[in-house]
Amino acid sequence: DLVIYWGANPAVSHPRHMERYSLEPRGQFVPEGRAGRKLVVFDIQETPTTALADDFVRIRPSSDFEVLWALRALVLGVPLRAKEVGGVSVEKLTALAEQMTTCRSGVLFFGRGLSLGRNGHAGVEALLRLTRDLNAYTRFYARRMRIYGDVAGADSVLGWQTGYPFSVNMARGYPRYNPGEY
């Protein structure tokens, strides 16, 4: 019942995604479709997707890691001393952490806005750790918004054969995982 897009603009890049997969489908646990879901969008600027959001959280450019780590701290019960993180007030982050821990089920879809930055691999790791932490409270999932020329098959085989989800280097004859390097 909670859908979060982070650094993604699916209204433009994946036009049918919300209609088919995330926001509008009616199902066993959310029979009312869109009316039963809340959409939160984290981005550095307004986009067509932020216009559809119930809650648009504007963050400073290149502050994804800090905001995700602050959310993670709040989910784990660690109080923040700062008044704002990445351009977002701690009060707003606290409310979002509460919303994430009390939803019945949530999903974090992340896009190139998170993964392509200077430290994109650290932002992705922070998002995945936040997702893991949220699973102590509720069902929470993280999914990457695929790029053009979908690499889902290659990712699936890499995960199956090596145990690593992406950024695998086989040059030495065995799998090495380091998303900041490869």
For each feature predicted by the language model, list its residue ranges.
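Extended redox/cofactor-interaction regions of prokaryotic respiratory oxidoreductases
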Residues: D1-E24, V30, R37, L128-Y182
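Short, structured patches in soluble enzyme cores that scaffold and shape functional sites
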Residues: G7, D43, F110-R112, R146
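Acidic/glycine-enriched edge-of-secondary-structure segments
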Residues: W69-V88, G111, Y164-E181
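Glycine-rich, acidic loop regions that bind phosphate or pyrophosphate groups
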Residues: L2-G87
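Conserved active-site and cofactor/substrate-binding residues in soluble primary-metabolism enzymes
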Residues: S62, E66, V88-E91, H121-R129
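Glycine-rich phosphate/diphosphate-binding loops that line cofactor/substrate pockets in enzymes
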Residues: D1-L2, K92-V107, L134
